[in-house]
Amino acid sequence: MSRFPAVAGRAPRRQEEGERSRDLQEERPSAVCIADREEKGCTSQEGGTTPTFPIQKQRKKIIQAVRDNSFLIVTGNTGSGKTTQLPKYLYEAGFSQHGMIGVTQPRKVAAISVAQRVAEEMKCTLGSKVGYQVRFDDCSSKETAIKYMTDGCLLKHILGDPNLTKFSVIILDEAHERTLTTDILFGLLKKLFQEKSPNRKEHLKVVVMSATMELAKLSAFFGNCPIFDIPGRLYPVREKFCNLIGPRDRENTAYIQAIVKVTMDIHLNEMAGDILVFLTGQFEIEKSCELLFQMAESVDYDYDVQDTTLDGLLILPCYGSMTTDQQRRIFLPPPPGIRKCVISTNISATSLTIDGIRYVVDGGFVKQLNHNPRLGLDILEVVPISKSEALQRSGRAGRTASGKCFRIYSKDFWNQCMPDHVIPEIKRTSLTSVVLTLKCLAIHDVIRFPYLDPPNERLILEALKQLYQCDAIDRSGHVTRLGLSMVEFPLPPHLTCAVIKAASLDCEDLLLPIAAMLSVENVFIRPVDPEYQKEAEQRHRELAAKAGGFNDFATLAVIFEQCKSSGAPASWCQKHWIHWRCLFSAFRVEAQLRELIRKLKQQSDFPRETFEGPKHEVLRRCLCAGYFKNVARRSVGRTFCTMDGRGSPVHIHPSSALHEQETKLEWIVFHEVLVTTKVYARIVCPIRYEWVRDLLPKLHEFNAHDLSSVARREVREDARRRWTNKENVKQLKDGISKDVLKKMQRRNDDKSISDARARFLERKQQRTQDHSDTRKETG
């Protein structure tokens, strides 16, 4: 199990005192050290205390700027106080009298932690005057005046209240991250003001906040709105390129040892000050924590450390799936004589401000979701960060004093491999969910929606195609009754389809735990230590065996049910090497999904179906109903080919219970793909062809022009030909033609399969006969 946070150092007495000190601090409901705030803070009108920020000198001016403009762009260095102080200023200026002040964040961790911090500064209980809402967790009330939320939650608000009548101010924070949902919110808010709806509040204000972005472009998009710059420089940060990664290493992200070495060198050779290390994800972070702890334990603090005031190193991981209490620890000051080292994902680059950081180690990579046109799927990839992200990271070292940033890559890597700015998510990921949302908002022409950066038309057409395959839209591109139901679920469309199919068969109990487990981080703990690794793998195999050993989806359901029914779920998770925090989140998700299904089944026109068969077959049939795009057929040996027209080869992931049984399988359905040395299918179960026989043809029925809902009167014949040519070119690029499609369909029907089996048996019988004749001749 993970031992972190942990202190590595000399003098057990000193270490134990430090741990007791930290435990006492954790008993306080605080995200920052209250004593530290009071020492250097100032008093707000609410009677609380807040740190000193550059924005405080601009308080009156920025309040007036919000009053005078429908749209306002606010920019300033990270740590200038935009996120925590501006909503408070607007509240104290009376803006909340006309509705809530809504503040969006791209990540749920940031939304929760910032809400906690502001609630403390305003001396109120979290969920009362200050609250938050993230997916599956709403900590707000009728009393809430300042509401922090993920951008996805605001999009859900707009579905139920297109004119945002419950809000007086909308603040879109961290706009420079260019998440898919934030870009859609840009367009919706612009459209709301352009249409001048009689139901829209005249006093609604929109503030877009960004640390680094193309501000002139954003201002032009919002009608040349003013840009309010918060002056205030950071302390100087000295940068050093460590030259451990060059342009040739772009695809090689096995750099953990280098990161740990640089971090340890800082601890041994630099004066007091905390360290912030940037890595890409949970596995890398936990592995680095283990390696760093082992190295720090061997340090002789009498001879090895230049700063004689140091007695140890406090190692703290930080990533999205951690519990709120675990995340809170990174904000607390370390015990006396202890240096703090936070090893984090990109969340600490912009969304969270950690006091005391003097040294930053920039790993140079980030996990990013990219659409793979060959596979037709979104793939989570490790890619080089942009130059603007790198500057954000280094800025963390100059918040409270001068600092240093150690970039493990070379200057050539900076120049050749790192783009200037973040590529907007809308230009590189699937648009299926947001296109469905736009359709449900009666925005039918999604191609000519006001995008800040228009996405590739192919991504839009791919989204329309998938929605049509799920029956969320009809042949004309209009949203169906099923589509209106699907948009209520905070799940991907294909998973929502599977859940609704199960509900129609009155067996949602089979699917809801699985849907909940697929909505949280990976629940399996895979330790770095080889001895613990073997034990964990054995426990995981035992859990898979209880599910029949032949269905990864069912394994997730077994884990959910067994943990929930155990008397001590946290202990059960520890014994079976399962992340308890992920299971705890899954329990909450399942309860909310169950409530959505309950309301859906109360509708008089909800479809009802019957099926008589074993539970395991019902489960797999429901999965086929939603995941038929992710169906694959065995090709050669252990390789499977997808049936979506691309024929992409995939392999079953080694973590699957079916990994050693590929040659026994003919047809599978999978949850997602992972690209490493091969393209792997993750979370797999076997299926029968007859379960998807009637579904697979839908993968090839697609009329781009009709589904796009472009107004017919505005489209001439040459435009129609353009749509048709695009589809023909796409099919040629994918290596598939109409003749091939027909052959595939013929190949997969019952008669073809029966004929192929007969030919195989005939050849086998002929070979046996020939072999027998040969033996007679030689005998």
Swiss-Prot record:
Catalytic activity: ATP + H2O = ADP + phosphate + H(+)
Limits of the Helicase ATP-binding domain: 63-231
Keyword Zinc tagged: no
UniProt keyword Nucleotide-binding, yes or no: yes
Keywords of this entry: ATP-binding, Helicase, Hydrolase, Nucleotide-binding
Top-level taxon: Eukaryota
Compositionally biased region (Basic and acidic residues): 13-41
Domain called Helicase C-terminal: residue spans: 263-442
CDD domains noted in UniProt: DEXHc_DHX40 (cd17984), SF2_C_RHA (cd18791)
Region Disordered, annotated ranges: 1-53, 737-779
E.C. code: 3.6.4.13
Biased composition (Polar residues): 42-53
A GO molecular-function descriptor: ATP hydrolysis activity
InterPro entries: DEAD-box_helicase_OB_fold, DEAD/DEAH_box_helicase_dom, DNA/RNA_helicase_DEAH_CS, HA2_WH, Helicase-assoc_dom, Helicase_ATP-bd, Helicase_C-like, P-loop_NTPase
Chain sites annotated for binding ATP: G76, N77, T78, G79, S80, G81, K82, T83
Chain location of the short sequence motif DEAH box per the record: 173-176
Enzyme class: hydrolase
Biological role: Probable ATP-dependent RNA helicase.
Family the UniProt entry places it in: Belongs to the DEAD box helicase family. DEAH subfamily.
PANTHER family per the UniProt record, alphabetical: ATP-DEPENDENT RNA HELICASE, ATP-DEPENDENT RNA HELICASE DHX40-RELATED
Name of the molecule in the record: Probable ATP-dependent RNA helicase DHX40
Organism listed in the record: Pongo abelii
Species classification: Eukaryota, Metazoa, Chordata, Craniata, Vertebrata
